[in-house]
Amino acid sequence: MAVTGPWVGSSAVVNTGQNWMVGAAQRLRMGAPFWMSNMIGRSVEVIHTLGADHNFNGQWFRDRCFEAGSAPIVFNITGDLVSYSRDVPLFFMYGDTPNEYVQLNIHGVTMYGRGGNGWAACAIGASDGGVCIQNDIGGRLRINNGGAIAGGGGGGGGYSQANNWAGKYVCGGGGGRPFGLGGNNGARWPGGNASLTSPGAGGNTGTRYYAGGGGEVGQPGQYANPGASYSTPPTSPGAAVAGSAPTWQNVGAIYGPRV
């Protein structure tokens, strides 16, 4: 809730918890000297802290922003976060986000877009890695990255001994880091699933021919080695930060494209 008039002093006390106006002004991020009338419409920061979650739905961030209204909001990230889907950015701020600003503090941990899937039998199933942060509010998003921001790795390229890509001929591509799925769909040699810490391996015939492994964070998947047979290309990684440029207070470690 913002400070309102006409009784600015009492409203400032209720909103900030400070009985002295100097303290209230500090909570409202106002320098001294100041006019009390300038407190009207200002709000204290709304602060949230999140620990590790490897299946996180970024809608949670958006919901908290709208709950706070126009008040500035702070997200402190203290554990690794991974989006639940490569189709949904981990952290998305669309243009209708109402807050004065959104402060994102990453405390020595990593925020991840989810990894893409490897190619499967019937030449289906591959997908790009997921975007980590989608920013459509420009500099109102302030990022203090004391850890890492990573786009999901791309899926690995597939390999088939026959052009019809029937399962009995196919090596599936590996999943991109983190948690991308290896290509299967009945593949004789399915690709491996990625974990938080490593991409999945491509399926291997046991000879010198094999499918491509999944990509590391912010990297495309790997190419298959088909010899004279058939292959599909690996997929692309997700961006670390897409959309419009935020206010970078500390860039930190970045894996994948950023604005």
UniProtKB/Swiss-Prot annotation:
The keyword Protein transport does not apply. A motif (GRM 2) lies at residues 124-131. One of its GO terms (cellular component) is virus tail, fiber. Residues 213-243 are annotated as: Disordered. The record marks 7, 20, 35 as: Interaction with the fiber protein p37. Keywords: Host-virus interaction, Viral attachment to host cell, Viral tail fiber protein, Viral tail protein, Virion, Virus entry into host cell. It is found in: Virion. Pfam families: GP38, Gp38_N. A motif (GRM 5) lies at residues 180-186. A motif (GRM 10) lies at residues 227-239. A motif (GRM 3) lies at residues 151-161. A motif (GRM 4) lies at residues 164-177. A motif (GRM 7) lies at residues 197-204. The keyword Cell inner membrane does not apply. A motif (GRM 1) lies at residues 113-122. One of its GO terms (biological process) is adhesion receptor-mediated virion attachment to host cell. A motif (GRM 9) lies at residues 219-224. A motif (GRM 6) lies at residues 189-195. A motif (GRM 8) lies at residues 210-216. Belongs to the receptor-recognizing protein gp38 family. The N-terminus is involved in binding to the fiber protein p37. The C-terminus contains glycine-rich motifs (GRM) and mediates the host specificity. The glycine-rich motifs assemble into a 3-layered PG(II) sandwich domain. Receptor binding protein (RBP) that is at the tip of the long tail fibers and serves as the phage recognition site for the attachment host receptor OmpC. This phage use outer membrane protein ompA as a receptor. This is Receptor-recognizing protein gp38. The lineage of its organism: Viruses, Duplodnaviria, Heunggongvirae, Uroviricota, Caudoviricetes.
